[in-house]
């Protein structure tokens, strides 16, 4: 996949494209992109995704501070795995926000050589999102751009005949509840946090459960709700099982800051300042306050047994 930014020389060939923010690049997004690639193959054109580095609503609403499933770099990496030919990263500015749908489509056609546009079944664009699919088709005829409506993605949970709508907002809600396993079903992969290992209070080592503390690389990244999780840890190019705690360590009273700290099984290397990825498998319990350190240690041993079983370790 080739990535073109706002200031890039757009050397792409004519393409079939779709537009969206694509936070999380979940199953629904990938189904839409599959349709783009299929139409492109039928017409002998390239396939493109048009997206934005910053959430459009953040530009239009100064007090909106979204917590996102993926950073911009993570999103690009996931898009590259879809097989799409081009990713066109447009800066969503107030000027772009004021464009009508027709004006925006004109830019896509003339600057980015987009010959056909596949519109998500529930997607709207243009100033105030006031126009709909029939309007896009009409403008497309005027501009010489084919406009197609994508099929909706229908996802059925295991052992259920009920279809659910997969959306980034629904996945965010699941993660904020700690339901990381169901979020993974919608995403099609385990939700993850990337960051750097930083220094902590060293209490974990004193009680027999040394931890690596993660500083997340992007402040806009969503962090699941407080609690204990079974996770997979990728560090120094290898994967390990881990027992993760997110929260404020109420038993230890180490200060007001929220911590993300993981005890990595069968691991004892110094990884301070190293990059690390945590992939969430299951939340096992909420954060609890214990009456003594001894009670905390006993619970950590029970957590270890349960999480090793979940991870088949």
Q: In which residue ranges do the predicted regions lie?
A:
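Glycine-rich, Lys/Arg-enriched anion-binding loops that position phosphate/diphosphate groups
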Residues: 141-247
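N-terminal catalytic cores of NTP/NDP-binding nucleotidyl/phosphoryl-transfer enzymes
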Residues: 8-71
């Amino acid at each position: 996949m080739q990535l073109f930014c706002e200031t890039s020389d757009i050397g792409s060939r004519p393409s079939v494209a779709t537009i969206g923010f694509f936070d999380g690049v979940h199953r629904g997004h990938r189904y839409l992109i599959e349709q783009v690639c299929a139409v492109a193959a039928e017409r002998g054109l390239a396939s493109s995704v048009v997206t934005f580095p910053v959430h459009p609503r953040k530009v239009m609403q100064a007090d909106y501070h979204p917590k996102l499933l993926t950073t911009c770099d993570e999103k690009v990496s996931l898009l590259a795995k879809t097989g799409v030919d081009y990713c066109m990263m447009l800066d969503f500015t107030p000027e772009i926000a004021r464009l009508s749908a027709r004006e925006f489509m004109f830019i896509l056609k003339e600057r980015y050589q987009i010959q056909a546009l596949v519109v998500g079944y529930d997607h709207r664009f243009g100033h105030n999102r006031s126009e709909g699919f029939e309007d896009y088709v009409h403008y497309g005829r005027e501009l010489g751009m084919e406009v197609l409506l994508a099929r909706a993605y229908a996802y059925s949970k295991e052992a259920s005949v009920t279809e659910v709508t997969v959306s980034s907002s629904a996945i965010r809600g699941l993660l904020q509840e700690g339901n990381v396993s169901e979020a993974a079903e919608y995403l099609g992969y385990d939700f993850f946090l990337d960051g750097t290992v930083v220094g902590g209070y060293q209490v974990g080592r004193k009680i027999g459960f040394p931890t690596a503390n993660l500083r997340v690389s992007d402040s806009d990244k969503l962090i699941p709700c407080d609690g204990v999780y079974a996770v997979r840890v990728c560090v120094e190019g290898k994967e390990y099982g881990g027992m993760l705690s997110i929260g404020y360590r109420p038993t230890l009273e180490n200060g007001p800051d929220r911590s993300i700290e993981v005890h990595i099984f069968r691991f004892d290397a110094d990884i301070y300042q190293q990059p690390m990825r945590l992939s969430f498998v299951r939340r096992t319990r909420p954060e609890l306050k214990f009456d003594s350190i001894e009670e905390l240690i006993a619970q950590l041993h029970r957590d270890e047994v349960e999480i090793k079983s979940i991870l088949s370790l």
